[in-house]
């Protein structure tokens, strides 16, 4: 899985292709070397990035502050770090594809 990596410090690094303005927020499936994610939030004033952070934190069972955007603040291609995600969260992410 090229889109999901474990860093040396134990955090997870995700490569995502984000589609803002969708009907609902959900993982779609592989998109090249990234995982495609639809976001219900519009790409205006950072709302999509905030929604992404909230969604990933809830999906992985971590606090919102544990999710940080590494790159792609204004792009659909994003790299995200998730700190403190346990083995259950890793298994859920791996099950996506």
Curated annotation (Swiss-Prot):
Gene Ontology, cellular component aspect: cytoplasm
InterPro entries linked to this entry: DUF167 (IPR003746), YggU-like_sf (IPR036591)
SUPFAM superfamilies this protein is in? YggU-like (SSF69786)
The family annotation for this protein states: Belongs to the UPF0235 family.
The protein's matches in HAMAP family, at most eight in alphabetical order, are given as: UPF0235 (MF_00634)
Report the protein name in the record: UPF0235 protein AZOSEA09540
């Amino acid at each position: 899985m090229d889109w999901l990596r474990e860093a040396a410090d134990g955090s997870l690094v995700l490569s995502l292709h984000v589609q803002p303005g969708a009907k609902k927020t959900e993982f779609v499936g592989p998109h090249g070397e990234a995982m495609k994610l639809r976001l219900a939030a519009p790409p205006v004033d950072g709302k999509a990035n905030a929604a992404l952070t909230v969604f990933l934190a809830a999906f992985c069972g971590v606090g919102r502050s544990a999710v940080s955007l590494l790159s792609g603040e204004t792009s659909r291609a994003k790299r995200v770090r998730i700190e403190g995600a346990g083995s259950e969260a890793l298994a859920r992410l791996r099950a996506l594809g």
